[in-house]
């Protein structure tokens, strides 16, 4: 019986893909217990050539070739072809820490949890690895069983929505029709929120098992574009839709709405402060956000009404004023969460 399917999308990672695949086979797992699904997303470089010998050596590796359609469709194809009880998504430039996966897999199988949440380390471009605990608050030691909505109730933190820090029960994903939104950036965020909202049983495990390579993929760098801004709008909308799901406890829905406001504030800061987006494109993003996301306006008090009016009726003026405000937000970006929570309490 295949216990675990490890899905690895591959695109333009010839520098990193071999160490990634090698790390999977340094886990001390029997080949019969897991499979590796490598999804070649039409990569134009030598990525597949770099791992050709590893593929030949292991009968539990399956290669799926597709035209370049993005990581979301690559992962979705992996899900549909997976035979394991549990699924792990790995980015092709990341690494598993030697002999750490069996412990997590054992906890998953024995608990039958929908989702296992674990910790990770980070490796920068200089090769320096930082081991840090970035996880949810645990009341009872190193392992805790909770509902998915408990995870949604927790404060946002670095790595909150990264799919590669989770094991997912395949039956849970299929039964709830959970998949990645195609052709957008930041697909992890919406997927994680939707999974947490549906999960009856999650296991938080204080266990570092994967090394995330940081530096070249950050949205805070110069590669932030109009396309990424629009995709952020889509993600915010999906999160907002969850806040209107009456099947979720009211206090959790307020927290989800609070998160949407936080992402909204961060997006506005990124748009107005990014040199790579033309002013005309910034205006397009503001207009798109205004019509896509439900009521994000401020309703109470003269100051709030003024901000709402400028944003909705005079976006050009709003954008100009917002640029002056950007430096303040850079120092205090998450402080706005408290203000938004007060607005939520007033309007609900």
Which residues fall in each region the model found?
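Membrane-interface aromatic/basic loop that binds lipid-linked glycans or pyrophosphate carriers
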Residues: 273-348
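A conserved acidic beta->alpha catalytic loop
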Residues: 23, 40-50, 67
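Short aromatic/hydrophobic "clamp" motif used to bind/position activated sugar donors
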Residues: 87
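Donor-binding/catalytic cores of nucleotide-activated saccharide
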Residues: 71, 92-205, 212-226
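Short, well-formed alpha-helical segments that are part of the catalytic scaffolds
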Residues: 13-27, 50
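Cell-envelope/extracellular polymer assembly enzymes that use nucleotide-activated donors
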Residues: 2-5, 35, 190
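Short beta-strand/loop segment that forms part of the nucleotide-sugar
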Residues: 32-42, 62-67, 92
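Glycine-rich, basic loop-to-helix element that forms the pyrophosphate-binding segment
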Residues: 66-82, 92, 103
